[in-house]
Each structure stands twice: as structure tokens, then as C-alpha cells.
Amino acid sequence: MLRYRGVSIWTVRVKAKKNVVLVGPMGTGKTTIGKLLAKELQFEFVDSDREIEARCGADIPWIFDVEGEVGFRGREKSVIADLSQRDAVVIATGGGAVVDPDNQIALKENGFIVYLHTSVEQQYQRTRKDRKRPLLRSEDPLSVLKKLMSVREPIYRSIADLIISTDSKRPKGVVRDIVKTLRASREETVER
């Protein structure tokens, strides 16, 4: 751990931004990378979709079936607002969480935002057999992924403090790159 005048530099950075938030489309590795990153940073890890399921007592496909996407997004907004107020958490968001402007504000205000980018083709390879993704219950899931990416990618990019590709990378390598960037940003925070 780096130190500056006897103070942990990470502590200085945490005061500026309490959390690390992983955003990006489904299939980028937010959950896998988030767990590893939280362990490395000694932070808690929370997957916002799993938190919604825990609070609701039902899985995401059921929520979509019964309440529709609007009902799900309302639950998601509440969870994002709560998680954003916590300290020292790595948050893996659902792919569509950043579409809501209130979620963007909450996450940005209290977190260092990492956009985990992956190609649509890689997303498709990683998600094509997963039946728990309501938005991919389609005759042509690849087209759905392309459409979602065209709408959401500009948002991911606009709120990101760091953009990192997960295509053809191992999760541990992505975590190393994120930690390296966090260390560099901590040094900038101290120098100011």
C-alpha cells in the first residue's frame, strides 16, 4: 500500500470517492471482476441484481414476468440509491442501471466508475446459453444485444472514470489494470 506522510493514500482516495462501481453490458464480467476487485481492495462486494433479488425474494426473470421492465427498474433505482450511500463497496450494476439519470448521478457522486467494455460478439458468446436474462428471450438475441449497446454505450462512456476492455482478457488481468489506475488516481488526489 502506498503511503503519503504516514497516511494511506487509498484512505485519501476513498474520502473523495467512497466506492468503485462497475458498469457495462451483460456478459462483460462485472460480477466476476467485482468479486476479485473487492478482495484486492478489501472492500465489500455487492451485485445490484442479486441485491434486488434478495429484497424481493424472487429472481430477475420472475420480476420481469410479473412487474415488467418498469417494475424492475423501480426496484433497481431504490437499490442503487441505497448502495451509493455506503462506503468501501465494489458495486456491480445491471447492464441497464445507468439508463436512469438518477442512477447516473447517485453512482457518479459516490463512486469511481469503471466501464467494462466488451464487443457485442463477445457478449453473445458469454450470454447465449444463459436463460436467466429476460432481455435476451428473443428469436434473435444478437440483434437485441446490438440494439442495447447502441443505446447504452454512449451513457457508459459519458459517466466512466475508466474504460477498460474485457475482450480476450482474464479477470485477474482486468483487476490488475483497474487497481493500477486507482493507484495512479490516488497519487493525483494527494498531489492536489
UniProtKB/Swiss-Prot annotation:
Superkingdom, natural source: Bacteria
Binding site for ATP: G27, T28, G29, K30, T31, T32, R133
Residues engaged in binding Mg(2+): T31
Coiled-coil intervals: none
Subcellular location: Cytoplasm
MF terms in GO: ATP binding; magnesium ion binding; shikimate kinase activity
Free-text cofactor note: Binds 1 Mg(2+) ion per subunit.
Cell membrane recorded as keyword: no
InterPro entries for the chain: P-loop_NTPase (IPR027417), Shikimate/glucono_kinase (IPR031322), Shikimate_kinase/TSH1 (IPR000623), Shikimate_kinase_CS (IPR023000)
Similarity section: Belongs to the shikimate kinase family.
Protein name per Swiss-Prot or TrEMBL: Shikimate kinase
Species annotation: Hahella chejuensis (strain KCTC 2396)
Lineage, highest ranks first: Bacteria, Pseudomonadati, Pseudomonadota, Gammaproteobacteria, Oceanospirillales
